[in-house]
Amino acid sequence: MGAQIRVYRQKIASTSSMKKIFKAMEMIATSRINKSRQALEGAYPYANALTRAASQIATQHNISHPLTTVPDQVRRSAVMVFTSDRGLAGSYSSNVLKRTEELLELLRSQGKEARVYLVGRKAKAYFDFRHREYDEFWTGNTDNASTERAEELTERLMHDISAPHEDGGVDEVLLVYTQFKSMVTQEPRVLRLLPLEIADANDLGDDVSERFEDLREHASHFEFEPNPEEVFNEILPRYVRARVYSALCHAASSELASRQRAMKAAGDNATELIKKYTRLMNNARQAEITTELTEIVSGAEAL
């Protein structure tokens, strides 16, 4: 009985230590997600303004550009996958990788070749374990979006979409990341980044035009200097970089939200285990006391 009580005490002590770790990680994720959400919300106006400007030029000046023209036949696609560097985030990375597998299967069924780029150690480990090929990977700070990382990813994507097909160029660029909707809802998403889909700027119901009525009412009166073509060529790389940065912000916020929920659930489970082991330890102690009393009474009666 004494040995059994010691076992339960050890389990209670180890579970209590793990509970402290879970609580600390939950608090860290909670504190960092506020900063990540602010970065995500701050990226919206800039990206939406660039979208409106690009649409304004393309629709009103009839500008044709290779990055806005869908080829007659898409033969090769670039797929960039955003996962996490670390675990302990629930099913965050596995959901993205599952969506990636579905996308790659769809591309194969359509006869398209896929060039895969991985962001996050989880994606790299997944492909390495299955001996799957990928073109390049980036790791580090997946839960902290940065403009430097967005610039690096954008340069690679712009290089591939602009390169000739015989040199490994691609016809379209697809992003697979987790869209942050709320603290409890995050959904894997596939976004076709390039070629751009240009819509009529006057029909765009984006956040910027909703906040600033003058932009919506007088959008058609904009003039672009020195000329619309040069402005359009300058806007496109900035637009792509803004969209990549937005995907990084969504992924970082989703990762932190998933980790916060996972650590809270782990802490709650640890609390239940501590209660269970405490109850079993008390039962074992009561059984030991009962046995000792029975032995004492039996010995007294024998005398």
UniProtKB/Swiss-Prot annotation:
It holds the Pfam family ATP-synt. It is a peripheral membrane protein. SUPFAM superfamilies: ATP synthase (F1-ATPase), gamma subunit. InterPro entries: ATP_synth_F1_ATPase_gsu (IPR035968), ATP_synth_F1_gsu (IPR000131), ATP_synth_F1_gsu_CS (IPR023632). Keywords: ATP synthesis, Cell membrane, CF(1), Hydrogen ion transport, Ion transport, Membrane, Transport. GO terms for biological process: proton motive force-driven plasma membrane ATP synthesis. It is found in: Cell membrane. It comes from the Bacteria. Its main location: membrane. One of its GO terms (cellular component) is proton-transporting ATP synthase complex. One of its GO terms (molecular function) is ATP binding. Belongs to the ATPase gamma chain family. HAMAP family: ATP_synth_gamma_bact. NCBIfam families: ATPsyn_F1gamma (TIGR01146), PRK05621.1-2 (NF004145). F-type ATPases have 2 components, CF(1) - the catalytic core - and CF(0) - the membrane proton channel. CF(1) has five subunits: alpha(3), beta(3), gamma(1), delta(1), epsilon(1). CF(0) has three main subunits: a, b and c. Produces ATP from ADP in the presence of a proton gradient across the membrane. The gamma chain is believed to be important in regulating ATPase activity and the flow of protons through the CF(0) complex. This is ATP synthase gamma chain. It comes from Kocuria rhizophila (strain ATCC 9341 / DSM 348 / NBRC 103217 / DC2201). The gene is atpG.
